[in-house]
């Protein structure tokens, strides 16, 4: 069997942050790309089509549409939505359904994006007391384990830490609501370091995996380019945008009072106690260039200035 990807690659989540980055990276590398979308008429879907992505309409609840989308496809990029309060089985159901179709279609390479520390959750502090988002971590592990056990020709699981694009819309409004006032107010301790990766780097790893399936086959790869304190994050944002940004560490109660959701604050406490713990040198050992946060800020300068909502160079007193 040939390990060379010469046919199309199906990208799921292509209208989102990770899938979109992967689709663009694959196009730039010369691959033929299909995107599984529910509604081809959306702005994001049309933007992909304008770049040369072939849109295929499909839904995880319609297996026939998945079979059609997978026809003549040699590679699949998989990324799933996490559990929803009204649908706790969402990630497992959609992940396994896509995996089943990919296995039946005998794709050459299956690249799945999960999260760093997935599979290690039972070692988390207070795991047995359900302190953390149990279903989130269990869903990630369940899909990862199924991929490893399904008997695919080649597969790799990418496990990114926090994605830098969380500082951009739409995620920033929920994750860092105070950034609009030039502040990052969280329950993250001053000494806590947050492992981060750019979405484009995930795209680069996906391209490398589809380009050389045998090299990546069977690996689970934790991804982060840098580990920064929130003060270092604020400094990089200030320097890169010309807008003054400060970081403030609050108690959990204070963080919630200032607009952070309880679930978000819980994840910030997890950052303090556990964190992603990515071996950045191991990630670098694959030889794929990784983006430093300052580089990422520079490349998203105007978008970040709009998020911060202040004129470049303005001071706290001028707001």
Language model region names:
Residues 2-46, 61-64, 68-71, 78, ...:
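Oxidoreductase cofactor-interface core, primarily capturing Rossmann-like NAD(P)-dependent enzymes
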Residues 1-8, 313-319:
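Eukaryotic N-terminal targeting leaders
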Residues 286-319:
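Amphipathic terminal alpha-helices
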Residues 57, 159-160, 249-251:
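Short loop/edge segments at beta-strand edges and connector loops
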Residues 49-62:
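Rossmann-fold cofactor-recognition segment
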Residues 221-222, 230, 234-277, 310-319:
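Terminal hydrophobic/aromatic helix or amphipathic segment near a protein terminus
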Residues 206, 210, 237, 268, ...:
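Hydrophobic "lid"/C-terminal helical patch
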């Amino acid at each position: 069997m040939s390990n060379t990807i010469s046919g199309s690659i199906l990208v799921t989540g292509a209208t989102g942050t990770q899938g979109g980055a992967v689709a663009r990276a694959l196009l730039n590398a010369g691959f033929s790309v299909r995107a599984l979308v529910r509604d081809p008429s959306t702005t994001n879907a049309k933007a992909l089509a304008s770049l040369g992505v072939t849109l295929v309409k499909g839904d995880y609840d319609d297996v026939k549409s998945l079979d059609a989308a997978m026809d003549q496809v040699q590679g699949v990029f998989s990324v799933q939505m996490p559990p929803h309060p009204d649908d706790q089985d969402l990630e497992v159901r959609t992940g396994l359904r896509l995996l089943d179709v990919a296995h039946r279609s005998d794709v050459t390479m299956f690249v799945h994006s999960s999260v760093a520390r997935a599979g290690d959750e039972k070692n988390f502090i207070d795991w047995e007391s359900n302190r953390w988002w149990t279903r989130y971590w269990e869903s990630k592990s369940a899909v990862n384990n199924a991929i490893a056990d399904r008997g695919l020709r080649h597969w790799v699981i990418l496990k990114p830490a926090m994605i830098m694009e969380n500082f951009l819309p739409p995620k920033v409004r929920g994750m860092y609501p105070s950034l609009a006032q030039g502040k990052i107010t969280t329950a993250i301790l001053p000494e806590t370091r947050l492992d981060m990766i750019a979405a484009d780097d995930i795209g680069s790893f996906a391209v490398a995996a589809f380009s050389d399936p045998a090299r990546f086959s069977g690996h689970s790869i934790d991804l982060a380019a840098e580990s920064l304190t929130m003060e270092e994050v604020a400094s990089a944002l200030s320097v890169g945008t010309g807008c003054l940004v400060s970081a403030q560490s609050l108690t959990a109660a204070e963080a919630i009072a200032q607009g952070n959701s309880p679930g978000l604050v819980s994840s910030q406490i997890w950052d303090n106690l556990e964190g992603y713990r990515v071996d950045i040198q191991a990630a670098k050992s694959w030889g794929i260039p990784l983006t430093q946060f300052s580089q990422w800020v520079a490349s998203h300068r105007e978008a970040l200035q709009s998020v911060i909502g202040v004129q470049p160079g303005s001071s706290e007193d001028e707001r």
